[in-house]
């Protein structure tokens, strides 16, 4: 589950490898709701095409989501089963993505009591700076 080698991932690999070879920076961007943080330079690697809930096991409290999935879509899916995440990330109304929320770690005031979103991530599949697919963790049941 998670990241399969689809056309989007292959295109990202080519973009990453091209940037690496040319020495050009890349900036990973979903909805762009956090573009005002820091200095955003480089060609955009857009995650919005990599969306969707890959799997959802409500009885196990486990969901696998792609990085470009809007946070609001994840919340709606969980809400259908009377489930929720204990986070209130900013910029949801502007289309914040799951990848952006996890990457920024901005999960709202409840963090003091429930922890950060990264404390709830069981695993991740990602591409490194060489365009290699790396897999960390996984589902625990």
Where in the sequence are the language-model features?
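Short, charge-rich amphipathic segments
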Residues: 2-20, 113, 118-130
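FAD-binding subdomain of flavoenzyme oxidoreductases
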Residues: 94-141
